[in-house]
Curated annotation (Swiss-Prot):
EC numbers on record: 2.7.4.25
HAMAP family membership: Cytidyl_kinase_type1
A GO molecular function held by the record: dCMP kinase activity
Alphabetically ordered keywords of this record: ATP-binding, Cytoplasm, Kinase, Nucleotide-binding, Transferase
Location(s), subcellular: Cytoplasm
Pfam family for this entry, one: Cytidylate_kin
A biological process from GO: pyrimidine nucleotide metabolic process
The species this protein was found in: Rhodopseudomonas palustris (strain HaA2)
Catalytic activity of the protein: CMP + ATP = CDP + ADP; dCMP + ATP = dCDP + ADP
CDD domains: CMPK
Protein family: Belongs to the cytidylate kinase family. Type 1 subfamily.
Protein name as annotated: Cytidylate kinase
GO CC annotations on file: cytoplasm
Length: 212
């Protein structure tokens, strides 16, 4: 079984992905980490993010061993990842890695921006997670503070809105809800409430009931 979770930055899809994977005993892949790893490699090498050739080369040399690097969660790396993820050739290189992960038994949960539309269009369950931008900015600020980093909520909100515009407007795999994805708005849900709602969606789809 493949569960695809898509949504904008800081919508809570990563947390839901981890919890759903644990609940069902599936493997989990935060596909945003893939792009962040490539972006960090470019930043560490002093590369020009507008140089698509360098970005493609970094994607081809992706090292999964870097996925656990805490530095990948930084705002700088996140912004850089948003830039390179708009390059069609970079996405093309990384599609194979994601699809191979999804195909391995017993099942997988992948979260990102284009899982249900591009990476796994035939996923058994598709969930599109959204949340109010202000709520997302507040959550991101709290995460940064928990890591001991300074966090200006207004600056974070402005960045989130810019990233939303960039993700929705890019020509390569723009952020959008798949026609058969179930919408989950977790603006007013805590983590446990969001997890319960996501599990209910999975169970409803598995039972053949489209509406929940």
């Amino acid at each position: 079984m493949i569960i695809a979770i898509d949504g904008p930055a800081a919508s809570g899809k990563g947390t839901l992905g981890k919890r759903l994977a644990a609940h069902y005993g599936f493997r989990h892949l935060d596909t945003g980490v893939i792009y962040r790893a490539v972006a960090k490699a470019l930043l560490d090498g002093g590369a020009d993010l507008t140089d698509q050739a360098q970005a493609i080369a970094a994607a081809q040399g992706l090292d999964p061993g870097l996925f656990g690097d805490p530095a990948l969660k930084s705002q700088t790396v996140g912004d850089a990842a948003s830039v390179i993820s708009a390059y069609p050739k970079v996405r093309e290189v990384l599609v194979g890695f994601q699809r191979q992960f999804a195909a391995e038994p017993p099942g997988a949960v992948l979260d990102g921006r284009d899982i249900g539309t591009v990476i796994c269009p035939d996923a058994d369950v598709k969930i599109f997670v959204v949340a109010d931008p202000g709520v997302r900015a507040r959550r991101r600020a709290l995460e940064a503070q928990a890591r001991g980093e300074p966090a200006d909520e207004a600056v974070i909100l402005a960045d989130i809105l810019r990233r939303d515009e960039r993700d929705k407007g890019r020509s390569a795999a723009p952020l959008k809800q798949a026609p058969d994805a179930v919408l989950l708005d977790n603006s007013n849900l805590d983590i446990e409430g969001g997890v319960r709602a996501a599990i209910a969606i999975v169970e409803a789809v598995r039972a053949g009931r489209r509406r929940v």
